[in-house]
């Protein structure tokens, strides 16, 4: 297995286990590689749009659907608290973990708190809409804004 694949899997496993982003050092330990090699793997994964990194080039901002930073899109699966990058990704966390969960967020227009149970088959029917200001083809122009 390539170092890039090992790195990606180590990152996602850490997020799944803890709900938090791993440090560069933790990933290096998990893949039994030196920090500089893992840093290079991060750069390649970023170029492939697998990761979004903070300006320091080593802190993980996003490993979709997981967010490396606290925000309004909270997902609880079992007893673990995760942050999603957006409303769309909040549905992806229970799917990625193959576990039911509860999404807590708020309506961007009204500020109304939102909470929804997500089962293994997806969310129940509801009247909510997901609206994104940026067309999907342009999301990666500025994925953090999107």
Predicted regions and their residues:
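Short amphipathic alpha-helical interface segments
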Residues: 2-20
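Amphipathic alpha-helical interaction segments
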Residues: 18, 49-52, 100
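Mid-protein regulatory/catalytic core that forms ligand/cofactor-binding pockets
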Residues: 79-146
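Short acidic, hydrophobic short linear motifs in intrinsically disordered regions
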Residues: 17-30
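Short, cationic-aromatic polyanion-contact patches
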Residues: 1-5, 23, 53-77, 120
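Basic amphipathic alpha-helical segments that dock to polyanions
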Residues: 7, 27, 37-54
């Amino acid at each position: 297995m390539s170092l890039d694949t090992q790195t990606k899997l180590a990152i996602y496993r850490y997020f799944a286990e803890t709900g938090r982003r791993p440090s560069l050092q933790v990933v290096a330990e998990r893949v039994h590689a030196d920090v500089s090699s893992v840093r290079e793997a991060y750069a390649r994964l970023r170029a492939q749009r697998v990761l979004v990194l903070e300006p320091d080039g080593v802190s993980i901002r996003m490993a979709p659907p997981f967010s490396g930073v606290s925000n309004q899109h909270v997902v609880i699966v079992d007893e673990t608290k995760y942050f999603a990058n957006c409303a769309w990704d909040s549905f992806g966390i229970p799917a990625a973990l193959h576990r039911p969960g509860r999404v807590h967020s708020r309506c961007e227009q009204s500020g109304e708190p939102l909470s929804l149970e997500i089962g293994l088959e997806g969310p129940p029917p509801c009247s909510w809409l997901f609206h994104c200001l940026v067309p999907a083809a342009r999301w990666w122009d500025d994925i953090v804004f999107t």
